[in-house]
């Protein structure tokens, strides 16, 4: 069973919310492009601030002889770049990009993006734009089945989200070590509860005791393990977590992201496991892509964070990445 306790509200009170990008339209009904700037950090980086850009827009038929037909909303993560240009200048150039979109398939359904226009202020982000990029369609597209194959598709940028990376040092994106399992270890996870201002899709409609629309997601932070054969108790781990002085914030990496900063003392084992860094970033694009799509331009706010202490999954438990369960008969073969 899990032991759960609440973090104090001060752990996320400063930067635990993201403002919405409210829809504004021209007289003909077209959406007016807008930009949003998020800074989940401390603002202590001495050199020019690095920025992560995330584009949100519409995939539409690219036919010069007729008005464009919008198919579905989608996104294009541009990644990190350095620039002194103002957000409005970056948005202006993004709206005139000639980004082509193509639907294809690999291990899963994918979208291919390629920009044909010359770049100026967006040159620091040219790797994704001019070299071409391929993304998991479910992560960057609202409804991929609506994208046709018999029409050229153009990605028209409507909104831009800029995340300022203003902390000193780098950020760890946990990908492999959350799968680390060990005997007699206690897994330290965090359960994050967020509140929406805009209504998400139906299956996220969960009301808390105050009748507010909420959703939850969980991230793995690390393991507490003793050298001896016996296991730490949850009561022993709790003060260790409190000494870490964890501070939480919301950013816009990959759409919406959870940023965790350790301001206090961290155990040597846990610190080494996290690459000797005290800045962690969890993009919801990797953790919960369905929820992430609902938060692309919505206002959301952290309302509760809980520390969840659970026994680590035993090492002899196998992790299955797909529905093809290996069998002794050899009827299925993974290519």
Curated annotation (Swiss-Prot):
The keyword Transferase does not apply. Gene3D superfamilies: Viral matrix protein, C-terminal domain, Viral matrix protein, N-terminal domain. It is found in: Virion. It comes from the Viruses. Pfam families: Matrix_Paramyxo_C (PF23765), Matrix_Paramyxo_N (PF00661). Signal peptide: none annotated. Belongs to the morbillivirus/respirovirus/rubulavirus M protein family. This is Matrix protein. It comes from Rinderpest virus (strain Kabete O) (RDV). The gene is M.
């Amino acid at each position: 069973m899990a032991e759960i306790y609440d973090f104090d509200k001060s752990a996320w009170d400063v930067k635990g919310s993201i403002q919405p990008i409210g829809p504004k339209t021209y007289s003909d009904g077209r959406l007016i492009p807008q930009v949003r700037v998020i800074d989940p950090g401390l603002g202590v980086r001495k050199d020019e601030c690095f920025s992560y850009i995330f584009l949100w827009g519409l995939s539409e038929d690219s036919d010069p002889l007729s008005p464009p037909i919008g198919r579905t909303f989608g996104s294009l993560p541009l990644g990190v770049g350095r620039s002194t240009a103002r957000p409005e200048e970056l948005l202006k150039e993004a709206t005139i990009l000639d980004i082509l979109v193509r639907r294809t398939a690999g291990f899963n359904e994918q979208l291919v993006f390629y920009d044909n226009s010359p770049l100026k202020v967006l040159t620091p982000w040219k790797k994704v734009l001019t070299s071409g990029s391929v993304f998991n369609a479910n992560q960057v597209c609202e409804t991929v089945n609506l994208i046709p194959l018999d029409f050229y598709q153009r990605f028209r940028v409507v909104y831009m989200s800029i995340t300022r990376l203003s902390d000193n040092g780098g950020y760890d994106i946990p990908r492999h070590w959350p799968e680390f399992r060990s005997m007699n270890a206690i897994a330290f996870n965090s359960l994050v509860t967020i509140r929406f201002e805009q209504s998400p899709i139906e299956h996220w409609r969960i009301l808390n005791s105050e009748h507010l629309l909420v959703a939850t997601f969980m991230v793995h932070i690390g393991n507490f393990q003793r050298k001896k054969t016996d296991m730490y108790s949850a009561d022993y781990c709790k003060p260790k977590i409190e000494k870490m002085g964890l501070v939480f914030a919301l950013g816009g990496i990959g759409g919406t992201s959870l940023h965790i900063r350790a301001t206090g003392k961290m155990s040597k084992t846990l610190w080494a496991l996290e690459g000797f860094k005290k800045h962690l970033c969890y993009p919801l694009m990797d953790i919960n892509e369905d929820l992430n799509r609902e938060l692309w331009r919505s206002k959301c706010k952290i309302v509760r964070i809980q520390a969840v202490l659970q026994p680590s999954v035993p090492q002899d438990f196998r992790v299955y990445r797909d529905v093809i369960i290996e069998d002794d008969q050899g009827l299925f073969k993974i290519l």
